[in-house]
Amino acid sequence: MRTGLTRLAPALAAILLPVLTACVSVGIGTDVPLQAHYLLHDAAVPAPRRAAPVVAALSIQALPADATADTAAIAYSQRANEFAYYQFASWTERPVRRVPRLLQQRLEARGVAGAVGMVGEPVRADWLLTLAIDTLHHDAAALPGQGRVALTAELFDRRNRTRIARRQFVATAATASADAPAAAAALSQALTQVFDRLVPWLETELQQAVVAPK
């Protein structure tokens, strides 16, 4: 009996080793044994502040997000319309909450409005910007892949309940490797690119709306 177990040991080890290795994987073909948390951030160099705000106040409302953004898990996709999540890597905060706050900080730093608040905060604003995250994931169809972010922004005039403008912003940033740390870094870069396009668009739309005939 002992001889049989001795013979089985190498075979069992050969079977179990790949399984145990897969259990600690947080990358596509990469092994990192510890749980890691990543901060989604705006990597832009602060832009010069406007001499004067375009409007007195602006409110931001986060709309329901795509499933890839309504979870703390970091999503990746190797095939179209099919997603998975890194097992031992996550965001410090769900993107559906984090992204609007980051945009608020960018708009405040730029001085687009005298006050920028989230819906529900004590800020009275005639202008409302809604923000929907259409996707936020590591596109790994061709390794090492790229971070892909898509946001849809809509600007409303609350005084007459009309939509002023609507636009989707999409950006990608190459990942340095096919793993969670590189995916998190690339997604922050892609989000920064989206903000770089969204903020000038918003300024222009607000400027035109302010001077438009009532």
Protein language model features and the residues they cover:
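Bacterial N-terminal signal peptides that target proteins for export
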Residues: 1-15
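C-terminal motif of bacterial Sec signal peptides marking the signal peptidase cleavage site
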Residues: 19-22
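Surface-exposed short loop/turn segments
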Residues: 24-48, 110-160
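A structural "domain/chain start" motif
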Residues: 24-96, 205-214
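Envelope-exposed proteins and targeting segments
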Residues: 54-56, 70-72, 79, 87, ...
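Buried hydrophobic packing residues in well-ordered domains
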Residues: 60, 103, 131, 151-153, ...
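Short secondary-structure boundary motifs at beta->alpha junctions and helix caps
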Residues: 81-90, 159-200
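Sec-exported extracytoplasmic/periplasmic mature domains
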Residues: 104-112, 199-207
